[in-house]
Amino acid sequence: HRGHLSLYKAAKKENDEVISSIFLNPTQFNNPDDFQKYPKTLEKDIELLEKAGVDAVYVPNLEEMYPDGLNSKKYDFEGLENEMEGKYRPGHFDGVGTIVEELFRQVQPHNAYFGEKDYQQLAIIKKMVEKTKLPVKIHGVPTLREEDGLAMSSRNVRLTETQRKEATIIYETLTKVKEWFKVLSVEEIKLRVLEIFRNSNFELEYFVIADEKTLKETDYFYKDKNYRAFI
């Protein structure tokens, strides 16, 4: 989708040649049902990348990415993996680290581009590169959104029409949080967000305001740090 294509555009501005990879990684899915239902549109994806001008598309098979069997490596992400998504998806980020490290070792890029939509994943990949000392620079690319603010995602096609309309609450809430950040405390912001979701059809797994580097949740805004809000 256009969110993925924005990664290509960012890469093309700074590199002579751009390779896009497509691989559905089974070790980062905690729920086998989610893996089975994940949208698979390979031919359409390749067509879009070709139209955009990508120089090459790498579509490895399972054996190429997991020559020693379907196992994840264990990483020390210095606690990044224990926050937010990590609390609900144990082992997920080891799966991410394993597949991205293998991809980098095979392709050997100078630069790699990942969307900020999965900000925790972006932080994890930066930490993996730091730990493994791979010679690649990781770049984050701002989230691309639909006109109503919903982040572009392959999984959006699985939403019903009603769910799709209701999903805009996420971006609307984050936009409010950005304004509240200027005048309210962390605790006051949290209470307001919880109230918004209490009156919605969504069950809120987490709302976190965290240090953008460590992803550690904060209960106070320190002037020398930058923060991000996550739903």
Predicted segments, located by residue:
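Substrate/ligand-engaging "lid" and interaction regions
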Residues: F207
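Nucleotidyltransferase catalytic core that binds NTPs
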Residues: R2-F202, A210-Y220, K225-Y227
